[in-house]
Swiss-Prot record:
PANTHER family: CARBAMOYL-PHOSPHATE SYNTHASE SMALL CHAIN, MULTIFUNCTIONAL TRYPTOPHAN BIOSYNTHESIS PROTEIN-RELATED. One of its GO terms (molecular function) is carbamoyl-phosphate synthase (glutamine-hydrolyzing) activity. Keywords: Amino-acid biosynthesis, Arginine biosynthesis, ATP-binding, Glutamine amidotransferase, Ligase, Nucleotide-binding, Pyrimidine biosynthesis. This is Carbamoyl phosphate synthase small chain. Residues 1-169 are annotated as: CPSase. GO terms for biological process: 'de novo' pyrimidine nucleobase biosynthetic process; 'de novo' UMP biosynthetic process; glutamine metabolic process; L-arginine biosynthetic process. InterPro entries: Anth_synth/Amidotransfase, CarbamoylP_synth_ssu, CarbamoylP_synth_ssu_N, CarbP_synth_ssu_N_sf, Class_I_gatase-like, CPSase_GATase1, GATASE. Pfam families: CPSase_sm_chain, GATase. The active site is at 247 (nucleophile), 331, 333. Pathway: Amino-acid biosynthesis; L-arginine biosynthesis; carbamoyl phosphate from bicarbonate: step 1/1; Pyrimidine metabolism; UMP biosynthesis via de novo pathway; (S)-dihydroorotate from bicarbonate: step 1/3. It catalyses: hydrogencarbonate + L-glutamine + 2 ATP + H2O = carbamoyl phosphate + L-glutamate + 2 ADP + phosphate + 2 H(+). The gene is carA. It comes from the Bacteria.
Length: 360
């Protein structure tokens, strides 16, 4: 059987068995520490352009089902596992992980020492990597990898091109799609909200023309500093309607208010990150997927830190002191992961009610 190679930017080479699509790819290699939820992770558009390493030793044992998609068209570049289950056993299963990746054109590699790989990423940071069959010249692959420039328009690639509705009978929410997870839509639909999903480059004027009760800024891939148009939109809407941001939305909200962001060494990607709510001391276990963070020292006086990561003190939430607006770095929608923080969707809707009363 043909072997598949995983070549890192620092020259490290791993050899494993191929599964999924039979193509060569290059992307940023990252790792996810979740024990389950591989379908949700692979279909999360926040992984656009990235080669996704799962640290859990066995992936694929319950297959792929019709319910757990976070997007219909996954855009991660590749999947790296220690062992892939070629058989899948679950009453909801539609197909195996191998079959799914073949259909979606995503290559996988198994038989990799993912512990050793994760240690390299933790020590040296995320880096470029190439997955290719071992019939290719290794030196040629290394030269190609070194010369590859990863794209920066990752959000443009995954955002909706046109606005579309998700009808409901409740509050009107404009949801900006920076790489939207379906679970965010589901959380608002549970609460009967009337949602309009809009492209990433919508203007403040266009948002306000939709007469929304609130603005939701979704998750998404890449560097938030690559979206100056989104910052202008947030500044134009802020103070006129309540705002809630998640993940990329959190970073954009912070940037729009004068804070700075920085690239993390290896990021937070997993489903068991403990976060403290500073006001109450409450601890929530959260789902996270981000490679950038808001710099605490850069926060203006108008923003207050509401949540922080217990382990490394990363800013995990902020709130505006003057306007009805807040954001969190983690995913209260979970999918996958714990639902400890799903109450934040209710707090956003309560904020809308309060704003209506005070702005009359």
């Amino acid at each position: 059987m043909t072997k598949r190679l995983l070549i890192l930017e620092d020259g490290t080479i791993f050899e494993g068995e191929p599964f999924g699509a039979d193509i060569d790819v290059t992307g940023e290699i990252v790792f996810n520490t979740g024990m389950t939820g591989y379908q949700e992770s692979i279909t999360d558009q926040s992984y656009n352009g990235q080669i996704l390493t799962f640290t859990y030793p066995l992936i694929g044992n319950y297959g792929i089902n019709r319910d757990d998609y976070e997007s219909i068209s996954p855009t991660c570049k590749g999947v790296v596992v220690s062992e892939v289950s070629r058989l899948a056993s679950n009453w909801r299963k539609q197909m195996t992980l191998d079959a799914f990746l073949k259909i979606k054109g995503i290559p996988g590699i198994s038989g990799i020492d993912t512990r050793a790989l994760t240690k390299i990423i933790r020590q040296h940071g995320t880096m470029k990597a190439t997955m290719a069959d071992d019939g290719d010249s290794i030196q040629h692959l290394k030269d190609q990898l070194r010369a590859t420039v990863l794209p920066t328009n990752t959000i443009e690639q995954v955002s909706t091109k046109t606005a579309y509705p998700a009808p409901g009978i409740g509050k009107n929410i404009v949801l900006v799609d920076f790489g939207l997870k379906h679970s965010i839509l589901r959380e608002f639909s549970k609460r009967q909200c009337n949602i309009t999903v809009v492209p990433f480059n919508i203007t403040a004027e266009e948002v306000l023309q939709l007469n929304p009760d609130g603005l939701m800024l979704s998750n998404g891939p890449g560097n938030p500093e690559d979206l100056p148009e989104a910052l202008d939109m947030i500044r134009g809407v802020q103070g006129k309607i309540p705002i809630f941001g998640i993940c990329m939305g959190h970073q954009l909200f912070s940037l729009a208010n004068g804070a700075k962001t920085c690239k993390m060494t290896f990021g937070h990607r997993g489903f068991n990150h403990a976060v403290r709510e500073i006001a109450t001391g409450r601890i929530d276990f959260t789902s996270q997927n981000h490679g950038y963070a808001v710099e605490r020292s850069s926060l203006p006086d108008t923003l207050m830190v509401t949540h922080e990561d217990i382990n490394d003190k990363t800013v995990e939430g902020v709130k505006h002191r003057d306007f009805p607006a807040f954001s969190v770095q983690f995913h209260p929608d979970a999918a996958p992961g714990p639902h400890d923080a799903s109450y934040l969707f209710d707090e956003f809707l309560e904020m809308i009610d309060s704003w209506r009363c005070t702005s009359k």
